[in-house]
Amino acid sequence: MVFKVFSFVAFMACSTVKVGSIVWVQDPEEAWIDGEVVEVNGEDIKVQCTSGKTVVAKGSNTYPKDMEVPPSGVDDMTTLAYLHEPGVLQNLKSRYYIDEIYTYTGNILIAVNPFKQLPNLYNDHMMAQYKGAALGELSPHPFAVADAAYRQMINEGISQSILVSGESGAGKTETAKMLMKYLAKMGGRAVSDRRTVEDQVLESNPVLEAFGNAKTVKNNNSSRFGKFVEIQFDQRGRISGAAIRTYLLERSRVCQVSDPERNYHCFYMLCAAPPEDKRKLKLNDPTEFRYLNQSHCIKLDGVDDSKEYTKTREAMGIVGINLEEQEAIFRVVAAILHLGNIEFAIGEEPDSSVPTDESKKYLKIAAELFMCDEQALEDSLCKRIMVTPEETISRCLDPNSAALSRDALAKFVYSRLFDWIVNKINNSIGQDPDSKDMIGVLDIYGFESFKTNSFEQFCINLTNEKLQQHFTQHVLKMEQEEYTKEEIEWSQITFPDNRYVLELIEKKRGGIIALLDEACMFPRSTHKTFSQKLYETLKDNKYFSKPKLSRTDFTICHYAGDVTYQTEQFLEKNKDYVVAEHQALLGASRCTFIAGLFPPLVEDANKQSKFSSIASQFKQQLASLIEGLNTTEPHYIRCVKPNNLLKPSIFENQNSLQQLRCGGVMETIRVCRAGYPTRKHFDEFLDRFGILDSATLDKSSDEKAACKKLLETVGLNGFQIGKTKVFLKAGQMAELDDRRTEVLGRAACIIQWKFRSYLTRQSFIMLRNAAINIQAVYRGQVARYRFENLRREAAALKIQRALRIHLDRKRSYIEAVVTVQSGLRGMAARVVLRRKTKATTVIQSHCRRLRAELHYKKLKKAAITTQSAWRARLARKELRKLKTDARDTVVLQAAKSMLAEKVEELTWRLDLEKRMRVDMEVSKAQENAKLQLALEEIQLQFEETKVSLLKEVEAAKKTAAIVPVVKEVPVVDTVLMEKLTSENEKLKSLVTSLELKIDETEKKFEETKKISEERLKKALDAENKIDNLKTAMHNLEEKLKEVKLENNFLKESVLTTPVKTASGRFLSTPLKNLQNGLFTSEESQLSGAEFTTPPRIQESGSDTKSRGSHIDPQHEDVDALINSVTKNVGFSQGKPVAAFTIYKCLLHWKSFEAERTNVFDRLVQMIGSAIKDEDNDANLAYWLSNTSTLLFMLQQSLKSGGTGATPLRQSPSLVRWMTKGFRSPAAEAIRPVDAKDPALHFKQQLEAYVEKILGIIWDNLKKELNTVLALCIQAPKTFKGNALISITTANYWQDIIEGLDALLSTLKESFVPPVLIQKIFSQAFSLINVQVCNSLVTRPDNCSFINGEYLKSGLEKLEKWCCETKEEYAGSSWDELKHTRQAVGFLLIHKKYNISYDEIANDLCPNLQIQQHFKLCTLYKDEIYNTKSVSQDVIASMTGVMTDSSDFLLKEDSSNIISLSIDDLCSSMQDKDFAQVKPAEELLENPSFIFLH
């Protein structure tokens, strides 16, 4: 039936179908498949499908496929060029596979259940995005529908309603939760009540789900009742009240459960309750109860019933159900479970029944839980009392009737319990009688059609028929409103009205409900007689029919299809009678809660005969619901279940298409098609079809006139031109596309012709250039050959000339050789003389080396001796120090004496070793002196011999010069040579003897050295022992001081006047006070031949006391300081004066070393008062500079000394003595101080204030950026004659730059440390990065080429600002924009279709997540060049890599706290020199602050 709706559209499209067209054809499995037309034979069309098979279809059953639809589909299906059934189905399917589960059809939202968690779609950030956004501005979402309803209610003062429908498992309940969550967020109260209305509304969902939801075949959490939540708002738009209306609870499920379904959740939760609750209610495993074990499904995967029980109890407390009422509710639930285990057997009489022996315990437990009489409960189940005018008759029931009575009691009790819970929630939340505006959320069951359809399906489908009638009327109204808004001419649209089906069901006389009520009033009526009555009465109604193979079923032709109902249970389920015995039994219960569930009937005996049925009550409720909806402005959400497997990423075409038909979506499309189904904005229309008449576009600058002229030029009739859109009849879009295809085809032919001509000409030019090049190469080769011959002739002449020259030179060389030989013979004689002279030089070098070695060994020995003497001196000094420090020790005198004896013994041993070592050194010195004398004598003889030899050599030289040289026969003075030779031999023997003596001396020296090293080692061991004794002595002194301090404390507590001992003060005096007695100059340390122990200056008790005490400042001084620094005292040498002044005063007053002082508290209060004005950035920057500088000085000077801590006594080193007294002025300005707890606490408070001021400044900048960022994200658009979009340069990015410059100038004027400025700007750029990047992956309009160019220009301005600001203040701010820079870079790439996934993930956008890649690729669009996004293979690769996590948004730091590292602060201020900083001038005039001068 629905296929015929589009037949006329398909017929019009068929006339334009040609070979090569891409069309949709019907398929029995996939519903619709696409393919290419390969043959057209009249009405028959042969299509080659993409699946591989060939199909022959009628033209009336084919639809054109829009090839320009993006791979990710469109947000609003009314913008599809071809609005037909396969196009709608394909759009939903393509969006579903990329997790875009929401799609608009006009103002109707279609939600496809993803069957997986998508938490990123419903967080607070998404709520903030949709707040105040127009419908359609952002991606489709339930938040957008809720926001539109809320805004319309506030602006127009009209109540709204949101209707959520769909079949079981489609996600209606979750969607309704999201709607109420958003409305509660929008209408939440500012004050924090104990239980706000919005909290109670939200927490009512888990309570109602526990008692009204169950697992069905299609859904694990199916609502078995309808729910309409009315949320009331006051005049300010805040929630002021709420009410919950429920419809048609499925009572039969309490007693009958099909496999693999479950009963209501509350039963299983109670069986999983804590042991004490189960023991109290006598519950065991759920498989032991008949009402639960009818199905094998007891537990749900991923659901912990024990945790759900706890959550339900908490939710019940929030909605106003106290603990006592909760206990009573679950007592009733447990009683129903025990009641179901009661079984009956035949009693003493044939038609009587009694409980079986096994069931009596359950009867007893049920009576205890109901708090009624056990026998009365048994009689109410097994007997009936009939009252006649004459007498009262008691009639027994057979076992079957007793079982039915038991089930009726269970259903009756559960129904009353559910109604009580709903009323309790309503009473607890409360309704606002003064409220005029409300938003209703209807969570209602969708159209149902199963193999077996009973009374519940009949009522559900009746509800959907009524809602469909309301829905169709509203859709038609919206369609006509748009026509009126666009001011086009239109005629009345005819649409199918299902009022005839409603009359069939609801007609007062002869309707199905009327006939059903009539049958229920007669006791002897059965479902067969009821069915026969239906056949006789409604046989002529075309919407009613009787199945051929059934005698009791009937079929109704609903708007969504034919449904066959089985009448077997209709009569029983329609009866709403109350058994008097049950009413009396439970009304008399001793439990006030249970008795309250069954109040006595107020009707008299005459009114009891009036019949009331479930169908009639439901009909009245439904009429009341529709009447309430008619007074509101409706909004529709249609939920679709994509598959029956309840698994993600599976989209079943047939199943989804049937739900779209049942949900009225296809009917909406048919109503739209009855008028003008295709509507395009002027710019979109001109972008697509402007090529049909480009001349008209060039002449016209008016979009409307251009569209009209274009349509008239192509000869299209029946169109309408509105104010902003072009309206086309069905089939006209296909005709325009055919014209456009023809124009593109002709243009392609021209382009090919031009291109082929270009290729041919290029080939000719290439051949001509090649011929010219070949000729040139040949001519060059001939010329080179000729040149080579000429070069060879010239070379031959040169060779001949060179040969003649060579022969002449050879002759001259022979003559020169003879001359050289004569000179060489003379040279040989001179070489012999030089060799002897060299030997003499070697001997001299050996002697000099020997002297140097002896000198080195002498120095080494002296150094060892000096070191030994120095270590002994230090040991003796430490011994004297220990003796002096232990002089006043009385209690530990014995220990000291024993230690002193050990020290003396070790000292004696050390002195003995030293004396032995000195004796050895003396003997070695004497022996070395003898050897030295011998060596000097030998050297003296050697010198004399050398002098004589030199004289003889000189004489020989003179003689040689006088006597002429005989050629080739040298004359040698043999006598002189023999003399020299003998002298040389003597010298050699002398040197040999000296070397032997030196070797012996070295051996003795090595033995002496070993002995000395052993003795030195023993001396070091002795020193270690002395150090250990010194440490032990120090520990004893510490214990002694603790004892003395305790004694002093006890004396002070007893005596009125405190007594302070000088010794205690002396012992607690820091060691640094004694350093003044050490060396003060380098001369005093190095004077004299020996090192002497420095004198020790003992201080008197009064001096020590004055140095260690804290100078308490007068209150007037503190007030003067605070009054002075509270004002802006400015800066000196680029440093804050206030911070330096405070530090100097605290240092002088010794407040850092005080155990108790209130100065720090006064300063903290002063800083807190100074920064109260959070909007004044200049004041905040001034105090940020002061607090950070003061924190730096405290960090540099304060040391955690603790209370009563004693510095570790160390042996003073030579370096410390030498450097004592030499300090720079900067070191005097900031010097180390042993801080106490108040000072350390003040330092922590100061650090907190620095972070607080940083946070306030960042918060001010954040507010300023947020106001401008929303305008910077999307490029403004304008239209020009050629329908291209151009960018108008806006100043929004410049506003950001100016704001950053202003803040930077303020911070620099206050000399704020650069590291703090870097942190502020890093946070600012991080905010820009998060906002812009998130907008690109959430808003389709922003993810475009034109917007990428706009954002690129803004990023260039920010980069220029960072470069001008320099790294000192900007830091790594530019790196914070890495996500945005990569995303914008991707948008500006032209050939995205050729990019692979690896290039995107590794090269283009390495810092973006896979979900963000996916969003950018699917949302991208190009309005200028119409370039495509990435290929489907890349999309498929991303889909395969993506995990279940859908978190594609960057996280924004919502806190305003900027963490501070003191180390970073100190490193940035290491070059601070405070020596030249001037204190506050106002204090310089005060005599109390004379120390500041």
Curated annotation (Swiss-Prot):
Annotated Myosin motor domain residues: 72-741
Dilute domain sequence ranges: 1161-1444
GO CC terms: myosin complex
Domain of life assignment: Eukaryota
SMART domains in the record: DIL, IQ, MYSc
Keywords noted in UniProt: Actin-binding, ATP-binding, Calmodulin-binding, Coiled coil, Motor protein, Myosin, Nucleotide-binding, Repeat
IQ domain mapped to chain residues: 744-773, 767-796, 792-821, 813-842, 836-865, 859-888
One GO MF term: cytoskeletal motor activity
Coiled-coil spans in chain: 889-1057
Region spans: Disordered: 1085-1114
Spans annotated as Actin-binding: 504-538, 540-563, 598-622, 622-644
UniProt cross-references to InterPro entries, sorted A to Z: Dilute_dom, IQ_motif_EF-hand-BS, Kinesin_motor_dom_sf, Myosin_head_motor_dom-like, Myosin_N, MyosinXI_CBD, MYSc_Myo11, P-loop_NTPase
One GO BP: actin filament-based movement
Record-annotated Myosin N-terminal SH3-like domain positions: 18-67
Residues that hold ATP according to the record: 166-173, 219-227
Gene3D superfamilies listed in its UniProt record: 1.10.10.820, 1.20.5.190, 1.20.58.530, 6.20.240.20, Kinesin motor domain (3.40.850.10), Myosin VI head, motor domain, U50 subdomain (1.20.120.720)
Bias-annotated ranges (Basic and acidic residues): 1102-1114
Subunit structure: Homodimer.
Domain writeup: IQ domain mediates interaction with calmodulin. The tail domain is a globular cargo-binding domain.
Family stated for the protein in its record: Belongs to the TRAFAC class myosin-kinesin ATPase superfamily. Myosin family. Plant myosin class XI subfamily.
Function, as annotated: Myosin heavy chain that is required for the cell cycle-regulated transport of various organelles and proteins for their segregation. Functions by binding with its tail domain to receptor proteins on organelles and exerting force with its N-terminal motor domain against actin filaments, thereby transporting its cargo along polarized actin cables.
Descriptive protein name: Myosin-13
